[in-house]
């Protein structure tokens, strides 16, 4: 394990270490990937927390019930593993697999202008989160937006009509009064 800061890379957050598991230095991971165990496909992780950066190597990992458990190379002590809680798990953007046409990573949607069918700017995509039914976009007001409201829009085919990354915008079927 290296605790020296990584060279400035274009890193994408794939999950977070939330606590320890067992007595051998394993950690519990909350994964943002779909399926959740895809985070285990990356052997080298960059961990970030409050300006602290660590490069680690994944020795092994498994899905245990609904919990993702990871063993990091050289991390064999439960108490030391406990200090890893709260670290974000990051990988270089260049290591992400290519997606099919019409598929997007969440990071690509963040910052897009959201425009309704009437041509009104509702705001920009701040972030997304998962629900049981579908992903949800948090759209925050920005300069030139219709009003100062924050909106929660479903990331579904019914709501999202088109995405133009080059133009930096997303067209939606959404009532501005909602």
From Swiss-Prot:
The keyword 4Fe-4S does not apply. It is found in: Cytoplasm. GO terms for cellular component: cytoplasm; ribosome. Binds ribosomal protein uS19. One of its GO terms (biological process) is ribosomal small subunit biogenesis. This is Ribosome maturation factor RimM. Residues 101-178 form the PRC barrel domain. Pfam families: PRC_RimM, RimM. Its main location: cytoplasm. GO terms for molecular function: ribosome binding. The lineage of its organism: Bacteria, Pseudomonadati, Pseudomonadota, Gammaproteobacteria, Pseudomonadales. The gene is rimM. InterPro entries: PRC_barrel-like_sf, PRC_RimM, RimM, RimM_N, RimM_N_sf, Transl_B-barrel_sf.
């Amino acid at each position: 394990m290296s605790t020296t800061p990584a060279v400035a890379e274009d890193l994408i957050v794939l999950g977070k270490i939330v606590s320890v598991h067992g007595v051998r230095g394993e950690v519990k991971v909350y994964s943002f990937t779909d399926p959740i165990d895809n985070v285990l496909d990356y052997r080298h992780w960059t961990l970030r927390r409050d300006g602290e950066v660590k490069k680690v190597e994944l020795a092994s990992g498994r899905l245990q019930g609904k919990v993702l458990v990871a063993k990091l190379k050289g991390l064999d002590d439960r108490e030391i593993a406990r200090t890893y809680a709260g670290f974000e798990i990051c990988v270089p953007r260049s290591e992400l697999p290519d997606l099919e046409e019409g598929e997007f990573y969440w990071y690509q949607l963040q910052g897009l202008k959201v425009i309704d069918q009437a041509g009104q700017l509702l705001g920009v995509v701040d972030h997304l989160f998962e629900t049981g039914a579908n992903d949800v976009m948090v759209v925050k007001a920005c300069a030139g937006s219709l009003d100062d409201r924050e909106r929660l829009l479903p990331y579904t085919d019914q709501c999202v009509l088109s995405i133009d990354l080059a133009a930096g915008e997303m067209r939606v079927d959404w009532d501005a009064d909602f």
